[in-house]
Structure formats: C-alpha cells, structure tokens
A protein has these predicted regions:
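Classical Sec-dependent N-terminal signal peptides that target proteins to the secretory pathway
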Residues: 1-20
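Active-site-proximal beta-strand elements of phosphoester/diester hydrolases
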Residues: 301-305
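Catalytic nucleophile serine of serine hydrolases
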Residues: 205
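N-terminal beta1-alpha1 cap of cysteine-dependent amidohydrolase-like domains
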Residues: 19-202, 213-220, 224-256, 260-262, ...
Length: 340
C-alpha cells in the first residue's frame, strides 16, 4: 500500500470515528486567506467542508435581514483552507462571535486587538460566523452549541448593533438597526454556553447587552432619554465606580482607594440590573447606568465599555485579567487527570 493511500485511509477512519461518537456535526477550521482568524464551520454528516461552506453561503443569501446588513453581497471567501478542529488544544482557544460584515475581513480593529492580546496569552482566536447554524436542523444546531461549549473554553460576544426589544418583551421605542434573526441565534448560543458551565463568557457593549438579555435581563433603550446627559455615553470617555464582587474580576484592577476607572464609551443603551439574578453588579457610571456585571459563578464578565479599543495599559490589563479568571475556572486537563 502506498503512503498516500495509507494517509487517505487514516483520514477516513478518523472521520468515521468522529461520526461514531454521536456528533451530528463536525467543527472545521476554515482559513480562506482573507480573514483575520479561522472561521469555525459546522459540517453535517455526509457533507464535505466545501459543501458545508457552500450551504452556509446559499442559506445566507436567503435571509433578507442578513443580506441587507451585507448590502446584498455575501462575504468573498474562497472554498479552501479547511481542516478539522484540533481536538488537543481546547484550553488555548478563544471564539469571537461575528455580528458585523467587517468581522469576515481583514480590517476589523476589534478582531485585530482581541487576537493580539489573546496571542500574547497563548490563545488562538477563531471567528464564529453570523447565524452559523444556517441550513442545520434543530438537533444539529443543539449539537453545534454543545460542541462549542465543549471545545471553546473562552467565548467573546462583541459590540455591534442594538438588540431587538421584543426578545426582552418590550416594544421598540429607541432601538436602531435591529436584526431579530441574528439576535435570536446569539441569544440561544449564549444560553446554551452559560448553561453548560464549561467555559468563560466575555461580553462587550452589545455583547454585554445581548448576554444579559439571554440571562433574563432587560435593556434601557436610550440612556440620554431615560437618565439625561449628565454622563456622555456616546463617543467619549468617563469614570466608572467599581464595586467589590464575589470574584472581584474588575475590582482587582482598581488602583485607587475610591474604586474608579476611566473607560471609553460607545453606546446609547445599557443593561437594567436587577437583584437575585445570575449577575452581580460590578461597576456603574456616576448617573447610575450599569457599566459592568460579573457572573456569580465566576464564569463571565459583561462590560459596557470596550477594553479592546482603549489602546492603553488599562485596556490590556482588563483583558489579561479576564484571561486569568478564565484559567481559574477552567482547570487544565492535566489537573483533571491527576485528580482522578
């Protein structure tokens, strides 16, 4: 038997083993050559990666809301650069949830900055495409969510457009550029990820808001309308008051006795905090607006501001602290083995 034939049989045997484990989809890395990080592509049983990518693009074209966001053009991604997701590097992966067209290209500053910080902490970044379950059945979607929880110990919900108000049982009074199809997918993904309790979730701006909605919280649809303009929450900087929490993720970075940090601000909506939920209030603006919440179980941090765009020492420290907390709640496989 020739060497190339032996390799082919080995690959086919691995594929059969993957399906035998009961997975309805396999996760592939898709590196088409013009994205900042590999795209995570779910491949159904009986599909090749090329067929899965074609299916995703075809189904994307059938979504009017999403195509309007893409201005009528699907992302220009080559049907090449596929390989199965490595099963042996789980602890060092970070998954960024795409929600804007620029996340598919080379010019997304937030993806650039997240990737840089994560690389410094020896984490590889990956991009989950918008509505990654396009063309999947309900059961296949559930399997996709389960595998994301199992294979990505770090997930980032990034900034972007407003969340559809009907998803937190409110009428639209001040929300802009809402896309229910996209929001519903992200909410279901976040619900599943949090429920699995196998990873750490970082939510930034919109990511904080949609994560809070997934956890049963509501949003203030327009901060100036509801609380006035005492604090400028638009394109500006302002101080926040940091509160001590159970895990003190953000509080551990406060250098001053008064518990204040200077952060950037690029939003007009905010989470309406409530007691007795899964989140703990971690920071507020001087006008009382929620600026940060932490998961009571230590497995998440939701920030209204953008540490990845602060471009200063504090922004980097915040992201490093988040990676540190992720490592605290995610013991390595070696430690689990020796604990047996």
């Amino acid at each position: 038997m020739g060497y190339s034939m032996w390799i082919l049989l080995l690959v086919l045997s691995f594929a059969r083993f993957a399906w035998a484990t009961g997975d309805l989809v396999r996760l592939y890395e898709w590196s088409p050559g013009n994205t900042l990080a590999p795209i995570i592509l779910p491949v159904k049983s009986g599909e090749t990666p090329e067929q899965a990518a074609t299916r995703y693009m075809r189904e994307l074209q059938r979504q009017p809301e999403l195509m309007e966001l893409f201005e009528g053009r699907t992302p220009d991604l080559a049907l090449s650069g596929f390989k199965p997701l490595n099963e042996n590097s789980r602890e060092s992966r970070a998954l960024l949830i795409a929600n804007l067209p620029k996340d598919y290209g080379m010019n997304s500053q937030r993806v650039i900055n997240f990737k840089k910080i994560f690389a410094q902490s020896r984490h590889s970044s990956f991009i989950l495409p918008m509505n990654a379950n396009l063309g999947l059945s309900l059961e296949e979607t559930r399997d996709l969510f389960k595998q994301i929880s199992e294979k990505f110990p770090f997930m980032v919900a990034m900034g972007g457009d407003d969340v559809e108000p009907t998803l937190y049982k409110k009428q639209n009074t001040h929300s802009r550029n809402t896309i229910p199809t996209r929001d519903q997918f992200e909410i279901q993904l976040i619900k599943s990820y949090v429920a699995q309790e196998k990873g750490f979730l970082l939510g930034v701006c919109r990511g904080s808001q949609i994560s809070a909605v997934a956890l049963g919280y509501q949003l203030m649809q327009d901060v100036p309308f509801h609380v006035g303009d005492k604090v400028s929450h638009g394109n500006d900087w302002h101080e926040i008051q940091v509160h001590k929490t159970k895990h003190n993720i953000l509080g551990s970075l406060v250098p001053n006795a008064d518990g204040k940090l200077l952060v950037n601000s690029l939003h007009h909506q905010a989470v309406i905090y409530k007691e007795n939920g899964p989140l703990q209030l971690a920071a507020q603006g001087h006008d009382g607006v929620t600026e940060a919440t932490e998961f009571k179980n230590g497995r998440g941090l939701l920030l209204q501001f953008h540490p990845e765009l602060m471009n200063n020492q504090l922004g980097s420290k915040i992201l490093w602290r988040i990676v540190q907390q992720k490592n605290v709640v995610m013991p390595s496989r070696c430690s689990k083995i020796f604990a047996l």
